[in-house]
Curated annotation (Swiss-Prot):
Record key words, sorted: Mitochondrion
Protein's name in the database: Small ribosomal subunit protein mS26
Subcellular location: Mitochondrion
Purpose: Component of the mitochondrial ribosome (mitoribosome), a dedicated translation machinery responsible for the synthesis of mitochondrial genome-encoded proteins, including at least some of the essential transmembrane subunits of the mitochondrial respiratory chain. The mitoribosomes are attached to the mitochondrial inner membrane and translation products are cotranslationally integrated into the membrane.
Amino acid sequence: MAPTLARPSLSGVQFILSSPTTTCAATSVVTRAIAARSFSTTRSARDSVSIPPDSPNYIKVPEPPQSSEVRHPFVKGHLPIPRSIFPKKGVPEKVQSGYVNRIAPKSAAELAGLPPKSKQESWRRKMAEARRQSLEAGLQGLWQRKVKRDQKQAKESKARYLANKRAAQAPERLDEVFTRATIRESTAKNTFVPLDPEAFVKAEEARIKHAEKEAMKSEARRDAVVQLYVASKNFIVDEKELEEHVNKHFTEKIHNAGLWESGRSIWDSQKNPISMRELRNEFSGFNDRVTATTSAAVKTTVRQKNVAEELTGGKL
């Protein structure tokens, strides 16, 4: 077993420190002896934790051996919400005289003034009378509590309303006036936004315009549905038609056109893309082609189709 470390005696330390002939060497020896610690490389919590001056633990305050704090035990669950037995307005019937006698009437023998026939009947009459008195006292107490609670709530509500009203109508505080940023009069006039006198008229116009846009969108959706319905007659619905279309379009001779069938691309089987010259001619109404798409006959046909679509209510 390893020998224990020598520790200085408290009486000897106190004597050395209180002695007027204490030298620096003796003081340093005692200090080193007091500061002697165990042979460990782990820093203690006191060395690693630094308590700031703003912490309440910076100054050690002695605590009593028994705390005077009263800690209430935690109660599980919750209290049920009491049922409202009185109406919100008016004096209820339950607090009026004669209510208890109507809901808990006495027996015919008791009303006739006949004495009880036995001790058990006497005890029953006594218990019934006690229940009537308890019921009446309970109803009166609940009613008085409700009246006081309503008066307290009304008083607090009125006081809160008056306080809010005074705060809303109170003049500006001096601290706000003195600390407010300075705004020049010219700047205030230039940045002031007056109320628009025609705000409601503009809002009504905007509402009408929005309704027109929504009607146009609805009409466009309806036309799209009708156009889809008309185009559904050309939809592929079985495998036989799908196979015919695949064999027709996915072939090496699909672009063959002309007398010699020498087409190699889609521009050979169909017309060339429109050029800037053709766009300019179409805009001016002039075209040198034999089958002009901007001729009067073509335009008339397009107009007739549009009129027919408007009359029938759908795409053609």
